[in-house]
Amino acid sequence: MGDHLVRAEEFEKKAEKKLNGWGIFGSKYEDAADLLEKAANSYKLAKSWDQAGKAYLKLADCHLKSDSKHDAANAYAEAAKCYKKVDTNEAASCLERAVNIFCEIGRLNMAARYYKEIAEYYESDQKFEQAIAYFEKAAEFFQNEEVTTSANQCNLKVAQYAAQLEQYEKAIKIYEDIARHSLNNNLLKYGVKGHLLTAGMCHLCKADVVSITNALEKYQDLDPTFTGTRECKFLADLASAIDEEDIAKFTDVVKEFDSMTPLDSWKTTMLLRVKEKLKAKELEEDDLT
């Protein structure tokens, strides 16, 4: 590992010498770029991620000065991979620079891909507001490029984290829109009942029985096959338990559904929120009697 570090530093010094010396304008930067790439690779072999990231940033600068924009964007993306191991904020900043160049040269699919990656950095750091913002940008770019599946994946992430942040209306709109658009697609229509279920659960979190009742009617009009599903019955039974303010019934309905279709952590979190509201309402009424 020490040998790799020594080699990396030697390559970097040679690159600096090239950049500071005389030479034909274009070839000077091209020669330095070759050396910086070798330096970055050696730093990676030495697992010196911060130094590798810095070398890639210098490499990107060389490519920009020789007007190799695509290569510069790729160097920023490589820098991000290195910084990801030590500093996700710096990694996101590098990818943002890559995205700006890809937008400039019309590589919008690459821009979308890297916006999604930035979102995932923030997601792994549990910075959900920032993750939402970048998943939204990625979804918009994927949609413009007509990569519908990727756009849907990003929008579903937006809805998931919006609901976690109690932005229920935003989440509901996304789930309902995706359900609506999926109905006419043979590959996607089987996911419709799942999207309607998650939208319905966001309605439940608002603790508004009228809202969930109206939503259920709308969903059955939208997709007549939803009526006979376990998901539709589950939402209707939960709405009934909420209307009756019956915590025991609510718990039984959840247990029964979970025994047939295991609930993931997001759904469990949403249902716990609804249950807590029911408990709070029960305590409030006890205090009044």
From Swiss-Prot:
Source organism phylogeny: Eukaryota, Viridiplantae, Streptophyta, Embryophyta, Tracheophyta
Gene Ontology CC terms: cytosol; plant-type vacuole; plasma membrane; plasmodesma; vacuole
SMART domains per the UniProt record, alphabetical: TPR (SM00028)
Protein's name according to its UniProt entry: Alpha-soluble NSF attachment protein 2
Family: Belongs to the SNAP family.
Organism: Arabidopsis thaliana (Mouse-ear cress)
Primary localisation category: membrane
Record's function text: Required for vesicular transport between the endoplasmic reticulum and the Golgi apparatus. Binds to SNARE complex and then recruits NSF to disassemble it.
Topological category with respect to the lipid bilayer: Peripheral membrane protein
Family matches, as Gene3D superfamilies: Tetratricopeptide repeat domain
Keywords: ER-Golgi transport, Membrane, Protein transport, Repeat, TPR repeat, Transport
Subunit structure: Binds to the syntaxin SYP21 and to NSF.
TPR repeats by residue range: 112-145, 152-185
GO terms of biological process kind: intracellular protein transport; vesicle-mediated transport
Pfam families to which the protein is assigned, alphabetical: SNAP
UniProt-listed PROSITE patterns: TPR (PS50005), TPR_REGION (PS50293)
Entry's localization field: Membrane
